[in-house]
Amino acid sequence: MPSKSACLRHTEAPGQLEGRMLQGQLSNPEKKLIPTSASLPAADSQSSQTNSMPPLSMPAKPSNQNLQAKANLITPQPPIRPKLERTLSLDDKGWRRRRFRGSQEDLTVQNGASPCRGSLQDSVAQSPAYSRPLPCLSTSLQEIPKPRRATGSEGGSPSLWSDCLSGMISTSLDLLHREAASGGPHSRLASLRATHTPPAMDLNIASSSLRTANKVDPEHTDYKLRMQNRLVRAHSNLGPSRPRSPLAGDDHSIHSARSSFSLLAPIRTKDIRSRSYLEGSLLASGALLGADELARYFPDRNMALFVATWNMQGQKELPASLDEFLLPTEADYTQDLYVIGVQEGCSDRREWETRLQETLGPQYVLLSSAAHGVLYMSLFIRRDLIWFCSEVEYSTVTTRIVSQIKTKGALGVSFTFFGTSFLFITSHFTSGDGKVAERLLDYNRTIQALALPRNVPDTNPYRSSAGDVTTRFDEVFWFGDFNFRLSGGRVAVEAFLKQDPEVDVLALLQHDQLTREMKKGSIFKGFEEAEIHFLPSYKFDIGKDTYDSTSKQRTPSYTDRVLYKSRHKGDICPMKYSSCPGIKTSDHRPVYGLFRVKVRPGRDNIPLAAGKFDRELYLIGIKRRISKEIQRQEALKSQSSSAVCTVS
């Protein structure tokens, strides 16, 4: 039979562990402690021998002798200061782990093995002596054990469990107050985890390249204050005591700032510091015509171009509206550059340019204007792109004798935009059904006589030819009244046109003189033309949709054309090629083409236009628009005031 001290040491281990979980300070020595196996009745002694450690739910009234022995032999070990986060933790997983470990210890005890073999002596020997026992603090509110009753037991004391519970709660609350008073770390709640995987989205529109600015509900009370603070931070000087501006972030922040503060692209401070205007380079950071600046205005490096030709027949009367000509409904957006060539232009050239400026509006400025007799060419560009143009140069060619100097010839205008050189030529070739050879001669004289470029350097001199001006530029557009006709006679052409209003014009082009000569390679070498899907633009009765009804009975033909040529294949992409049947002030219908042209970065060491444009024409166009708007509003007012209600 084991000694009393050994048995006591063996049976006190569970009580000591449970005392650590609950609270073990004895405020009254007469209060009953948690019962142990030493105080069990004699009736249960047999079961105690079988199970060396009875379960905790089998309490018995302990004797005073056992209480005194416990107090003399056991000095509680001071508890470890629990962490505040763990004190407030409600993690079920940890509680299940502790319950599982406790169940394993109970099974070990029932099988005859002690769960704390030799640990109690070590803890008693190492624990310091205190004048009074310290409370055993719980590390979690979930560690409160529930009282368990064994069959046939007398039951535990209710006051004992209530005292332990109240002491534990008071100690935990005391810890909270001490932690807050000492300025310790803030309490953190346990992270929430999804219990199940959310269903897949029907459509995923996530994109790493798209990023928008954060939105705030305008109805929110502090919306104005927050927006004001953002603007102050964005435009404030970046000092050591100021908050960091959102414009000083990464590339995504710049795109977000563009949508938050201004439509203008933000400019980095470091780009300005490293920018040099003395010497240009394709790889220079911050160059005016370099890749960085080009990407700001043309991220895809493609500009929109409008090229049109119109033989005005020298009419003084201009159309009431040029919207159908310059602003066709097929185009959703306006173009970046407008180039208009006129043959047999009106006598008042300034009035013609004013009408163009008035129609395009204040968003466009006249970059250049040139004339050769009655050949006019006008270049309008978006006003924010005027700074990336070189000096504009022009040259003229006379192809006929002196008596015809004002009607036949060619006019060429060239300039460089960023790093791409452009050449625009408008021509009026010799007229007549059978004068194909004369028209070929006009073409050859033009490409040899146009002296361009002059001061602006060639972007690729190794691919240039002295005998062909079109080889000295990256992108070439040649448009005008070429006077090539449809062979076969008027009767055959009219019969073909009357067959079907939606006639396939490809059959007509088989009889086109220009198409035939281009296939031979005798004219416009290297040039291309977009597919034609409109009716012949010549010759109409003025103000009507009928072809020539005079005694000459001229054959309807595609005399007005727009051709293009590029050094690099695929740089020019035609988007639209059509005519304007609504403008009927001439015997020719205007023909236009919409293009997308690839633009490359350039160098700053070229003669720049430096924002030069026709300022006087710009102001006149604005005044015209204002005066017309006032007249329109007055007409609406007079119409509404003069309305008469009649009763029948």
From Swiss-Prot:
Q: Which InterPro entries match?
A: Endo/exonu/phosph_ase_sf (IPR036691), INPP5E (IPR042478), IPPc (IPR000300)
Q: Which stretches of sequence are listed as region 4 X 4 AA repeats of P-X-X-P? A: 59-243
Question: Keywords on this record?
Answer: Cell membrane, Cell projection, Cilium, Cytoplasm, Cytoskeleton, Golgi apparatus, Hydrolase, Lipid metabolism, Lipoprotein, Membrane, Methylation, Nucleus, Phosphoprotein, Prenylation, Repeat
GO process annotations (BP): cilium assembly; negative regulation of phosphatidylinositol 3-kinase/protein kinase B signal transduction; negative regulation of protein localization to cilium; negative regulation of translation; phosphatidylinositol dephosphorylation; phosphatidylinositol metabolic process; response to inositol
What's any one GO cellular component for it? axoneme
Q: Which SUPFAM superfamilies match?
A: DNase I-like
> Sorted alphabetically, which CDD domains does this protein's record hold?
INPP5c_INPP5E-like
Propeptide residue intervals: 646-648
Q: In what ranges is there compositional bias, type Polar residues? A: 36-54, 120-129
Query: Where is the region Disordered?
Result: 1-64, 99-158
Q: Does the keyword Nucleus apply?
A: yes
Would you identify the family this protein belongs to, as annotated? Answer: Belongs to the inositol 1,4,5-trisphosphate 5-phosphatase type IV family.
Assembly and interactions? Interacts (when prenylated) with PDE6D; this is important for normal location in cilia.
Function field: Phosphatidylinositol (PtdIns) phosphatase that specifically hydrolyzes the 5-phosphate of phosphatidylinositol-3,4,5-trisphosphate (PtdIns(3,4,5)P3), phosphatidylinositol 4,5-bisphosphate PtdIns (4,5)P2 and phosphatidylinositol 3,5-bisphosphate (PtdIns(3,5)P2). Specific for lipid substrates, inactive towards water soluble inositol phosphates. Plays an essential role in the primary cilium by controlling ciliary growth and phosphoinositide 3-kinase (PI3K) signaling and stability.
Supply the name of the protein.
Answer: Phosphatidylinositol polyphosphate 5-phosphatase type IV
Lineage of source species: Eukaryota, Metazoa, Chordata, Craniata, Vertebrata
UniProt lists the gene as Inpp5e
